[in-house]
Amino acid sequence: MEISIPDEGMTVADALNADAGPIVVYGQLFDDGQGLRLCSGLTRSLPPICVGEPLLVDGLALVGVALEDHEGTMWSTDAVVLEGVIDGDTLRDSRVR
């Protein structure tokens, strides 16, 4: 699924290589029961699959985020911009911008 690229933030790949600290990152949210992740993109399958290495997302309230749901998998149809604190492969204290 192609997403429009926001004007702000870094890619998931860049975030995974970033030094620890506050960041702004964009991608598509994805949860197949193994925890909420931010992906660079999603496949066009149903349900979709995360493309590339995902960024784990910890502490995000999904209020106001448009999500699709199929067979226990949830994903955002549009790109989301998140800010939080990067800690290795996890975005902590995250919120939607």
Whereabouts are the PLM-identified features?
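OB-fold and OB-like single-stranded nucleic-acid-recognition modules
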Residues: 1-97
